[in-house]
């Protein structure tokens, strides 16, 4: 077999037989393409009408632009026929008319310098067959008029499609006698900048825009595009950009339908320009809570920002259910000590230990690693490590996040529990950390990542005076983690079960087995039995070995009434 010496790109003639698949086949695509052509032709307005005729429903689109100069290029796939200025600035593909492919279409047009207009009728099969179509004279004012036979689907979608197409379109659009609403694509922008033939609008929203939200507007044609979103490190505020393209030839759309942007250096430059515009908007406000990394990025883009506002939030312990960090009240202008983040059970026990006294010489605040690098953040003392030292008759061990515990560890009283905090004076300090010790009375040690309190060791100091209710609440906050499997009980049911188990465990440890069992029985009766008892009636019960006896008691039997309650 002999191979050719060269090859080159060509367009196969068979592509003409696939023109009905170049666009999605919806009326919205067709309207956008025809409106763009009217704008390029210099029209001052576009009139759209729905005509109900005997042969069906017709969509007529009329503009007063320059008209179609060369009708031979009308159906030439890839030949736009536009003058060089428009070809340079807008990159027309010469495919827009094929958004009508497969439909019965009549096109009339006349240029300003022509004595007569012309008309061509395109039957549905002609779009793919390539058959010759006759041009005939037509009486028409300057401009172009297109009539399209509507299917039921296009008829149903037409009104909304016209409204959407006209929303950001720069020319007046009339549907029947009614002018369609128009608004600026950058409406409600906090600030607008001009950049390389574009207008960049900066908007305030702490949430990242949805990936399908339109971020770029091309004369009424809007597309989603990934553009920068900058937000405060603590989620208070956010900024994002939208772009109105005016004349930017290097920003290109994927052809033919222009529903997404071509990923090229021009788009990369636009993203960087949007980012810089956001930082300039923030600079004008004079304050921010950006991360140190974002602050450095602004400097790279030539935008000088002050350091983030120097405040932090009071440290509050996490709960296992969400594992989220909930900021406490704002702390500023006073001594602070930055607390590192630990698992929920450790944070809950640390919080209880530290409430017994101060000793830290400052408010304990939640760490914000995003601020590491700012001068004011580096200057605060910080907890660099912590552990609980537990002493029993037989041994001493330390417990911290990730530490192993003795295999035979079980719930009960121990000699002492001590919280040890390693505190460093500043982030850059080369001095050894100070070790601060605080007496603790409770330590909860889960041995598995679940809500089963049977796998939790509860250690109490000798002098611990915690109540059963307090201990039950501490257990739930430290250990409850709902099972989200599809076959699991509801969140409410799981939480109720955990609460009951926590109360039982607390009663067992603090009151003894008999008291714990009796309280659990009372709770079960209150929850599952009392609603069956008629109002103002009393029932006495006797239960042993799964045998339950019950009888109505006299109404004046106060003990029975009290027990039922």
Question: For each predicted feature, which ranges?
Answer:
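Mixed-charge (acidic/basic) macromolecular-recognition segments
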Residues: 243-312, 460, 468-515
């Amino acid at each position: 077999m002999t191979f050719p010496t060269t090859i080159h790109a060509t367009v196969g003639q068979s592509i003409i037989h696939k023109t009905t698949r170049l666009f999605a086949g919806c009326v919205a695509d067709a309207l956008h393409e025809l409106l763009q052509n009217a704008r390029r032709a210099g029209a001052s307005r576009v009139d759209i009408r729905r005509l109900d005729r005997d042969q069906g429903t017709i969509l007529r689109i009329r503009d007063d632009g320059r008209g179609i100069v060369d009708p031979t290029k009308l159906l030439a796939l890839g030949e736009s026929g536009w003058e060089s200025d428009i070809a340079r600035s807008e990159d027309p593909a010469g495919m827009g008319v094929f958004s009508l492919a497969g439909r019965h279409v009549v096109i009339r047009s006349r240029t300003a310098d022509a004595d007569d207009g012309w008309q061509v009728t395109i039957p549905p099969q002609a779009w793919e067959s390539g058959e010759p179509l006759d041009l005939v004279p037509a009486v028409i004012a300057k401009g172009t008029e297109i009539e399209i036979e509507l299917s039921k689907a296009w008829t149903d979608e037409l009104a909304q499609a016209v409204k959407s197409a006209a929303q950001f379109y720069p020319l007046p659009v009339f549907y029947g006698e009614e002018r369609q609403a128009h608004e600026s694509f950058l409406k409600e922008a906090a600030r607008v900048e001009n950049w390389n033939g574009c207008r960049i609008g900066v908007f305030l929203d702490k949430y990242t825009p949805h990936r399908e939200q339109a971020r770029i507007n091309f004369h009424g044609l809007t597309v989603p595009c990934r553009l920068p979103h900058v937000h405060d490190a603590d989620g208070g505020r956010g900024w994002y950009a939208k772009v109105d393209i005016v004349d930017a030839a290097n920003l290109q759309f994927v052809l033919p339908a222009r529903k997404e942007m071509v990923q090229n250096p021009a788009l990369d430059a636009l993203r960087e320009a949007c980012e810089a515009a956001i930082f300039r908007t923030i600079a004008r406000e004079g304050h921010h809570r950006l991360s140190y990394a974002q602050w450095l990025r602004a400097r790279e883009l030539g935008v000088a920002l002050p350091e983030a506002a120097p405040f932090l939030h009071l440290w509050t312990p996490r709960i296992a259910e969400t594992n989220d960090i909930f900021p406490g009240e704002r702390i500023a202008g006073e001594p602070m000590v930055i607390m590192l983040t630990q698992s929920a059970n450790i944070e809950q026990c640390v919080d209880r230990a530290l409430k017994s006294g101060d000793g830290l010489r400052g408010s304990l605040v939640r760490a914000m690693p995003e601020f590491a690098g700012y001068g004011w953040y580096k200057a605060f003392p910080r907890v660099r490590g912590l552990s609980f030292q537990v002493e029993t008759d037989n041994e001493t061990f330390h417990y911290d996040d990730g530490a192993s515990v003795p295999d035979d560890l079980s719930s009960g009283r121990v000699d002492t529990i001590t919280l040890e905090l390693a505190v460093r004076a500043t982030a850059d300090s080369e001095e050894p950390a100070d070790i601060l010790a605080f007496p603790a009375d409770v330590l909860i040690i889960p041995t598995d990542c679940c809500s089963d309190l049977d796998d939790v060791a509860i250690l109490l100091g000798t002098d611990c005076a915690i109540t059963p209710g307090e201990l039950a609440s501490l257990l739930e906050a430290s250990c409850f983690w709902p099972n989200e499997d599809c076959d699991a009980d509801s969140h409410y049911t799981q939480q109720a079960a955990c609460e009951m188990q926590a109360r039982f465990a607390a009663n067992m440890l603090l009151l003894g087995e008999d008291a714990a069992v009796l309280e659990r029985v009372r709770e079960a009766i209150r929850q599952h039995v009392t609603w069956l008892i008629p109002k103002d009636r009393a029932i006495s019960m006797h239960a042993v070995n799964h045998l339950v006896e019950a009888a109505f008691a006299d109404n004046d039997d106060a003990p029975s009434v009290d027990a039922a309650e």
